[in-house]
Every structure is written in C-alpha cells, then in structure tokens.
Amino acid sequence: MKSVGINGYGTIGKRVADAVSAQDDMKIVGVTKRSPDFEARMAVENGYDLYISVPERESSFEEAGIKVTGTADELLEKLDIVVDCTPEGIGAKNKEGTYEKMGLKAIFQGGEKHDQIGLSFNSFSNYNDVIGKDYARVVSCNTTGLCRTLNPINDLCGIKKVRAVMVRRGADPGQVKKGPINAIVPNPPTVPSHHGPDVQTVMYDLNITTMALLVPTTLMHQHNLMVELESSVSVDDIKEKLNETPRVLLLKAGEGLTSTAGFMEYAKDLGRSRNDLFEIGVWEESLNIVDGELYYMQAIHQESDVVPENVDAIRAMLEMENDPSKSIQKTNKAMGIL
C-alpha cells in the first residue's frame, strides 16, 4: 500500500484524493490547504488528515474549528509520492524548492509548463515512458481529451494530420472571477494554440494544429476535430474502435444527448459524485469520413477527465504496474468508470 499526499485540495485535488482512496493499492495520508475555507472543512469531514501549507495560519484554522494534523512539510515526509494540485505555476516552484531537495517523487497538473517538469504523461500515450520516473506532469484537460480519442484512431488506421477547434468553457462552475460573460473570445487569438504542442509532449510524432475559443459557459469544453487518416477505414470501424476504448463514450444525439448540458444531466443520472464525467463523450452522429478525412465532435468535463490519469501516473512512477492496460482497468473498476 503506497502512501500518497495531495498538495492543494481544490477542484482537481479533492477529486484525486477520492480516486486514490478508492484504490486498493494506495492510500491518502493527508491533504494540504492554505486557507480555512469550506473545502478545508469538507476535507476533514471526509476523513482526510489536513495539513496546512502556511504554518503561520494555524490559528485561523483553530478559530474556524477546523482540525489541523500538521504542516505540509510534515506531510511530505510521510509520502512515497505527492500529487501537486496547486494553482498554475506553483507546482514548478514546489518541485525546485521542496520536492527535489527531499528526494520526493511528484506528479503535477497541466497548468505547469512541460519544460519546467521535464516529462508529461497520458495513460494511453506514453505510460511506459514514465515508469520509475521522479517527476511527471499530467497533461491538461483539453489535451487529455484529445489524446483519449486520437490514440485509438491512430492505432486503428494511422493519422497523417489533425486539425482541431477547441470551444473552451469560460470558467468552472464555482468560479466567479473569470469569464467571459457575454462574449466569444479567441483564446489565444494566434494560431496554433498551445494545445497541439501539448499533445506532442505525449504523442511525440503527431502532426496536429489547434485553435481555441472561450465561450460563456461553465459545464464542459467541446472539440471539433478533422483527422486525415493514413489508411482507409469506415465510420463503423471508427465507432467500433471508440466503443471498445476505455474512458470514451459514444453519445447519441437521437437519445436526447444533444448538448453538453444533456451530457452533464447524464452524469447526474449515473449518480456520480460531483456530477463528474471522467469519460470523453463523442457524438456518434458527428462521425463522418469524407475523402479520407475523419470528422467528429467531442465533449470534455474539465473538472474530472484528468483524475484517473493521476492514479495511473502514481502506479507508473512507483513501478506498481508496468502494463498500462492493467492499470487503466484497475483504476476504472475502482472508480466506476464506463
């Protein structure tokens, strides 16, 4: 049983904590928070030992009636690996300032830059390259979504080139300081966007160009893909391959799943904690091949799709499982992923 800690119990951190707790080969030793907010209180109520990353704030936690087990440094000393879910840019500083000095393995999130971490990870793309490594970055929610569907397509028939238009949510549901509220924003306004190069950190030789927008919604990201194929296949071949791919779901618009809102309603009906959708949803009706080019649309739940990848990264880096398919299967079974 490997000892895991979560540095940053926020949107991703709390989900990774629950995912790790669901496994039978790893356990959560503790989680960290900076402020005595509702998430800190919920962490304790959910049975996690809480460690504070700013020791000087211990009195504010005491005043709020939130039990503190110790400091973040004390937590890190107890771990085999830490999953860093701190805000963008903080993880890289933690790597250099703390983890490397302690000799502690660490997993980072997609907000960190690939060059600062040195290695990126996706369960379906480069699991074997991360086995036994000390530091790795789980690629972003958008990149994870692209890799989930492009990998099986590449395995089936090869890919010459990918062009993707990313329609990104403006903010997470709980965020009130981001937007837009009443605009469509090219983000970035330059082409290509950073998503293509991010995919190439795990699918090394893929020819991909991306462009991205921000829109006033909070539910999900939506991708529109155009994929030039190397070999001739039918739409039915693509459907069959995606159907058998873990963490990918074919959505039927004809059954009422006509939007990201419908997809999230489906998550509620599944009884998922926090309405999470770890799977990437591909609209079956959007699948089409014209002159050797595959077209399809997909939806990504930005708050949760990277969570199972964090669990797989733990197994790879701690050399708990050398077969990616076995880790994926084990993670999925424990988390109830379709």
From Swiss-Prot:
Pathway: Carbohydrate degradation; glycolysis; pyruvate from D-glyceraldehyde 3-phosphate: step 1/5
Signal peptide: none
GO biological process, one term: lysine biosynthetic process via diaminopimelate
Gene Ontology CC terms: cytoplasm
Record keywords, A-Z: Cytoplasm, Glycolysis, NAD, NADP, Oxidoreductase
Highest taxon listed in the record's lineage: Archaea
InterPro entries: DapB_N (IPR000846), GlycerAld/Erythrose_P_DH (IPR020831), GlycerAld_3-P_DH_AS (IPR020830), GlycerAld_3-P_DH_cat (IPR020829), GlycerAld_3-P_DH_NAD(P)-bd (IPR020828), Glyceraldehyde-3-P_DH_2_arc (IPR006436), NAD(P)-bd_dom_sf (IPR036291)
Chief location category: cytoplasm
PROSITE patterns registered for this protein in UniProt: GAPDH
Enzyme class, UniProt record, top EC level: oxidoreductase
Known catalytic reactions: D-glyceraldehyde 3-phosphate + phosphate + NADP(+) = (2R)-3-phospho-glyceroyl phosphate + NADPH + H(+); D-glyceraldehyde 3-phosphate + phosphate + NAD(+) = (2R)-3-phospho-glyceroyl phosphate + NADH + H(+)
Subcellular location: Cytoplasm
Positions contributing to NAD(+) binding: T11, I12, G111, R169, Q302
Active site: C141
Positions annotated to bind D-glyceraldehyde 3-phosphate: S140, C141, N142, H195, G196
EC number(s) on file: 1.2.1.59
Annotated family: Belongs to the glyceraldehyde-3-phosphate dehydrogenase family.
Record note on quaternary structure: Homotetramer.
HAMAP family reported in the protein's UniProt record: G3P_dehdrog_arch (MF_00559)
UniProt name for this protein: Glyceraldehyde-3-phosphate dehydrogenase
Species of origin: Methanobacterium bryantii
Source species taxonomy: Archaea, Methanobacteriati, Methanobacteriota, Methanomada group, Methanobacteria
